[in-house]
A protein has these predicted regions:
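Helix-loop boundary and gating motifs at the non-cytosolic
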Residues: 5-63, 220-271
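Hydrophobic alpha-helical transmembrane segments
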Residues: 110-117, 121, 146-202, 245, ...
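Structural signature of transmembrane alpha-helices in multi-pass secondary transporters
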Residues: 29-30, 61, 151-155, 159, ...
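Flexible cytoplasmic inter-helical loops of multi-pass small-molecule transporters
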Residues: 2-3, 143, 194-220, 408-414
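Core transmembrane helices of Major Facilitator Superfamily
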Residues: 119-131, 325-336
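C-terminal transmembrane bundle of multi-pass solute transporters/carriers
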Residues: 57, 67-71, 78, 82-94, ...
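Loop-to-transmembrane helix entry/capping segments in MFS-fold secondary transporters
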Residues: 51-52, 141-151, 261-262, 346-355
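Short hydrophobic/alpha-helical segments at membrane-entry points of transmembrane helices
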Residues: 21-22, 108-115, 231, 316-322
Length: 416
């Protein structure tokens, strides 16, 4: 009976018209985004063969989230998020066109790649914040947890499929083919956003406050909440110590495993397979109870999987480590996202969820720079082992508080 109820929660989530259209449009955007990301990563490695440059490019993609996500969240709480995400999506299409065109005419260099990466990195805080605010408007509250997990499953299933497709495209059409694919996928997503029909939210209260004051409100809200504060700290350490290893995979493929674009695609796909399985598990189980415990398990598992990955030079064991990193990171991040969404007042959701974006999308930039710097001195494997051990050590400070954290979210959440 339990399994039937959990499967029913997935069907109910997909029965909502706007949610189904929204996810159907995001799917090709996610898919071709991963295709382009593999192409850009391999292009950066071909241009420089430098782990430090890989860290710089990864940081350029993610660092704007650190600065802009809080402002994007506050802005999203002041406006209708649907026109905002449409504008952001159109801009992403333009960036993909520029990547393709400049590669075709031979004007692409590491500096140009860096500039275009920074450009699109500045767009994604607004796109992601608007997306986070739109999801609750497309779904009934009782179907929200599986809806969040399904959105994550879409993202990570494409993380498995996208690199595999990129591995086929690059030998045939070079990296330019990956950029062209993203033009098409992003355009399809834009069309789906134009088909959404959502009631504009009431933003009258938010517009009366200073933008920076609203950002400060969200930070104070999260700091006072007995559950949000430690959960966000866990997310921070995972995002700095473990998640950046995914951005260093081109270096592991070429330097540690003595491979090329094929091995890079295998590793990226393995991370995606693990993450997809984790997301479908969260969607299948449904409900809020037990998500705090799953968050802790995911955090610990990601650190152990990272240690297993950096400890080997055998590609097959490395692929298992990649899958473990993807699985455990995703059950942690998806559970964290669902807990935060359901524990936060509607008027604060855009700003509070922007903190999630700052940490999970932005903090890996700092981690990538750190790993890149340590790697230039001691090698990728030692750098990866060091940050994984730091991640696991921090967990020991949070475990004694697990029961109190769970109570603040699940019994039901207490709001400050």
């Amino acid at each position: 009976m339990d399994g039937a109820r959990q499967r029913s929660s997935i069907r109910r989530a997909l029965s909502h018209r706007n949610f189904a259209i929204f996810e159907a449009g995001l799917l090709p955007h996610y898919l071709t985004g991963w295709i382009q990301r593999v192409g850009a990563g391999w292009l950066a490695w071909e241009l420089t063969e430098s782990p430090a440059w890989l860290g710089v490019i990864a940081a350029a993609d993610l660092a704007p989230m650190l600065v802009l996500a809080p402002l994007a969240g506050a802005w999203t709480d002041r406006v209708n998020p649907l026109p905002l995400i449409r504008l952001a999506q159109a801009t992403i299409v333009v960036q993909a066109v520029a990547m393709s065109a400049l590669t075709y005419v031979g004007w692409m260099s590491i500096e140009v790649l860096l500039a275009l990466t920074i450009f699109v990195g500045c767009i994604y805080p607004f796109h992601s914040s608007a997306r986070q605010s739109i999801i609750p408007a497309t779904i009934a509250r009782e179907d929200f947890a599986p809806a969040v997990a399904l959105d994550s499953a879409s993202f990570h299933s494409t993380r498995f499929i996208g690199p595999a497709i990129a591995a086929l495209i690059i030998p045939l059409y070079d990296v330019q083919g990956t950029f062209i694919a993203h033009v098409g996928g992003s355009a399809i997503c834009l069309i789906s956003l134009l088909l959404l029909r959502l009631k504009p939210p009431d933003r009258s209260q938010a517009r009366g406050r200073n933008l920076l004051a609203q950002v400060a409100d969200s930070m104070a809200y999260a700091t006072r909440h007995n559950g949000l504060r430690p959960i966000l700290l866990l997310l921070t350490f995972a995002s700095v110590c473990v998640r950046p290893l995914q951005d260093m995979l081109p270096g592991f493929a070429g330097d540690v495993f003595q491979g090329g674009a094929r091995e890079l695609a295998w590793m990226s796909s393995s991370v995606g397979v693990g993450a997809m399985i984790g997301a479908f598990y969260i969607a299948w189980r449904g409900g809020l109870a037990g998500l705090t415990r799953i968050t802790m398990i995911g955090y610990a598992g990601s650190g152990l999987a990272a240690l297993a990955f950096v400890a080997t030079q055998n590609i097959w064991i490395g692929l298992l480590g990649c899958a473990g990193i993807g699985f455990f990171l995703n059950i942690m991040s998806t559970s964290t996202q669902a807990l935060m969404q359901l524990a936060t007042d509607d008027a604060m959701r855009g700003r509070v969820m922007s903190l999630y974006l700052v940490i999970y999308r932005g903090m890996p930039a700092a981690g990538a720079l750190l790993i890149g710097f340590i790697s230039s001195l001691f090698g990728l494997r030692i750098a990866g082992a060091l940050v994984a051990l730091i991640s696991l050590a921090f967990l020991l400070t949070i475990l004694p508080k697990q029961a109190a954290i769970a109570a603040s979210f699940e019994n039901p959440p207490r709001r400050p």
